[in-house]
Amino acid sequence: MGKKKTSVVQSDELPVIEFRYAEPLFQFVCHPEEPMVVSALATGHVLCHRYDAELLTEKLREARKVQEAVKVEEKKQTLWTVVDVDAADKHPVLPSGVTLLWRTKRHKGSVRALAIDHDGKHVYTIGADNVLKKADTHSGKVVKKVTLDGGSKVTKLVKSATHDFLVMGDEVGTIVVLDSNDLTTKNTLTKIHGGDAINDIFQFCKRSVYKYISLGQTTLAYWDTREPKMKQPKKNSGNQTEEELSNIMCSDDQEDEILCGAFVDPIEGDTLVCGMGEGTLTVWKPKKNDLEDQLTRVKIAKGESIDTVISTLQDDNCVWCGCSNGLLYKVDTKRGKIVEIRKHSGLDEVGMLDLDFEYRLVSGGMDKLKIWEVPKEENSDSDSDSDINDDSEAGLSSSEDSDSDSELGSGSESEVESDASSKSDSDLEECTGSDLPGDIEGSEGENNSNDDDNHDDREELWKELDQPTSDEEEPPKKRSLKVKDKKNKKFKKNENNLSHGITKFDGL
């Protein structure tokens, strides 16, 4: 008797907005309390956009109605709002429902990592210049910065959702814990994954708010961000110190690269999933074997890599997986099945995932970022007023390219810090009111990163882009939480920062 074919649901859900970037997008993060998204580019620019989710959803619904009425057969045009983002464009014309709050040339070279406070008050960035900057999300001004020691490039930056510290991982497997107030170093852990790069970091709050999990090469490790109180000699498998061994627990070799991970329910912390280089999603149970090894695996996409994963935070035992084939897979981890598939891009991989303040899925690759509509069943439970018409058309016809000017304010250049070494901290452009943004001065330097071919590997871009360029700086703002008893869930979301990826750092 043959195997039963499991039917996978090809989703009819569409994005409400799509940002298309002229330069490669390396990182993005959603504000946890307001409809804002901060994006960081390969050129060192950081931009912040605000979007009106209700208006954009209404525009999408109207476009669907038009498609129904005219019965258009062609499916080449998009129904959702599209925003072209060019960091060099100082006077962008944006469609209604979208506002550019600020843009800045924050780092020399590319932006390596990006993080935000659990309340959205501050945003943290680190560039190829190894300068870590903390900026006020409301004003966009840099309030603190520090140049990090060592030549290793940072691959991951996470802000604790509960305490005032940052956790940072680099290319050689070093974890640095910093005080998020003054950016001073509090603790350092070395060679966690045998000297391999840190692919992902997330909090293990069920065990302790100080416990974190890191992924690197073919192993998973969990450790304490605090310094060990005493030496507890353990079996030495290499040249690690006793203190390190007493503070780090490492899994068995998985014989496949572990690229990303997340807890299905970050508060419960009973099930952990990891995206693998060969296209499977491995399932781990801390209570079963203390994370020594995976228990089961779910086949997602053979021959592709799972580059990013995030919980849906909907109490449905599901996670979203972003794959190198440009598809988004919703996986029921309890049943071990794919329950929904969405298409992010036909050319680019999905390298980043996040949830916005109303739990919309946000997917990002090197050329675009999409904020997806909330499914009808989820939206009806929330207290938001954005009613989404969940018709069964999957068509992509009918243009929805409203070019009405958004409200942008004139950029004000504000001297944020007086460090002689930081031109890039002085030029900020804040966009509020109805004026177009003013100029942000500062030479662009040598940024050879116009990504004409979206198939270019990130590792090649790093080589080209990690060259010192001139700096500028700018301001951010804030956003608000949803009412539906989701505050605790949002707390979960903030524990899993979404940017990831070892491949883009290879060869540096």
From Swiss-Prot:
<feature type="compositionally biased region" description="Low complexity">
    <location>
        <begin position="407"/>
        <end position="419"/>
    </location>
</feature>
<comment type="similarity">
    <text>Belongs to the WD repeat WDR55 family.</text>
</comment>
<feature type="repeat" description="WD 7">
    <location>
        <begin position="431"/>
        <end position="472"/>
    </location>
</feature>
<feature type="repeat" description="WD 5">
    <location>
        <begin position="253"/>
        <end position="294"/>
    </location>
</feature>
<feature type="region of interest" description="Disordered">
    <location>
        <begin position="376"/>
        <end position="508"/>
    </location>
</feature>
<dbReference type="InterPro" id="IPR001680">
    <property type="entry name" value="WD40_rpt"/>
</dbReference>
<feature type="repeat" description="WD 4">
    <location>
        <begin position="193"/>
        <end position="233"/>
    </location>
</feature>
<keyword id="KW-0539">Nucleus</keyword>
<dbReference type="GO" id="GO:0042273">
    <property type="term" value="P:ribosomal large subunit biogenesis"/>
</dbReference>
<feature type="compositionally biased region" description="Acidic residues">
    <location>
        <begin position="380"/>
        <end position="393"/>
    </location>
</feature>
<dbReference type="GO" id="GO:0005730">
    <property type="term" value="C:nucleolus"/>
</dbReference>
<feature type="repeat" description="WD 1">
    <location>
        <begin position="62"/>
        <end position="105"/>
    </location>
</feature>
<dbReference type="GO" id="GO:0006364">
    <property type="term" value="P:rRNA processing"/>
</dbReference>
<dbReference type="InterPro" id="IPR036322">
    <property type="entry name" value="WD40_repeat_dom_sf"/>
</dbReference>
<feature type="repeat" description="WD 2">
    <location>
        <begin position="106"/>
        <end position="145"/>
    </location>
</feature>
<feature type="repeat" description="WD 6">
    <location>
        <begin position="345"/>
        <end position="382"/>
    </location>
</feature>
<protein>
    <recommendedName>
        <fullName>WD repeat-containing protein JIP5</fullName>
    </recommendedName>
</protein>
<feature type="repeat" description="WD 3">
    <location>
        <begin position="149"/>
        <end position="188"/>
    </location>
</feature>
<dbReference type="InterPro" id="IPR015943">
    <property type="entry name" value="WD40/YVTN_repeat-like_dom_sf"/>
</dbReference>
<keyword id="KW-0677">Repeat</keyword>
<feature type="compositionally biased region" description="Basic residues">
    <location>
        <begin position="478"/>
        <end position="492"/>
    </location>
</feature>
<feature type="compositionally biased region" description="Acidic residues">
    <location>
        <begin position="441"/>
        <end position="454"/>
    </location>
</feature>
<keyword id="KW-0853">WD repeat</keyword>
<dbReference type="GO" id="GO:0045943">
    <property type="term" value="P:positive regulation of transcription by RNA polymerase I"/>
</dbReference>
<feature type="compositionally biased region" description="Basic and acidic residues">
    <location>
        <begin position="455"/>
        <end position="466"/>
    </location>
</feature>
